[in-house]
């Protein structure tokens, strides 16, 4: 949804906003193969409500466009939120969730529970990782000079004017299997304090950057 409002003969206000869900509506039955043994397994993956990654599902923008005597200025403030990371299906396999619960019982000071009643998984156990959103301000200033033949145009564009480098642009969850081992009897051993599942890989916005452009029209 967007709108453009003419404030004066030389100044316009622009707004834009969108919200999306883009999520799975059910769990799935998965078939996968372990590369180290080439064995094929079947399991249930609890991926319901997992959302599309790599793009903000909530966006908003407000901007001012000014045009006076050959000058133009565009100032835009853009808001991004609900940025989900690419989820790991294997982290949500029923067998893995069961092993994670066993790891919690064996080492409750390290691993969180995946079920409280033995009937359903906790929200945190299957929650999708998210990235930090926020505001980004962009500025463009230009001047057009008419010549006898054609015109000369100057344009300075600055992206991320406020140097906000906390906005996540994407990333992915990391597998949790290296946090512990499970022997043939189902006993959890060799726990590790560092959990990859709690430390997803994230990518962040570039800092302030810009470009100066000169063009000639004829």
Model feature map: region roles:
Residues 1-89:
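Gram-negative outer-membrane beta-barrel transporters
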Residues 34-45, 112-123, 189-195:
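Flexible, solvent-exposed coil segments and beta strand-coil junctions
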Residues 45-50, 124-128, 197-202:
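Extracellular loop and loop/strand-boundary signature of outer-membrane beta-barrel proteins
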Residues 78-108, 113-117, 132, 143-218:
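C-terminal beta-signal and adjacent terminal beta-strands/loops
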Residues 1, 58-62, 135-141, 208-214:
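Hydrophobic, lipid-facing positions within transmembrane beta-strands of outer-membrane proteins
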Residues 4-6, 10, 65-69, 142-146, ...:
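Structural signature of outer-membrane beta-barrel channels/translocons
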Residues 51-57, 130-134, 203-207:
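Transmembrane beta-barrel outer-membrane domains
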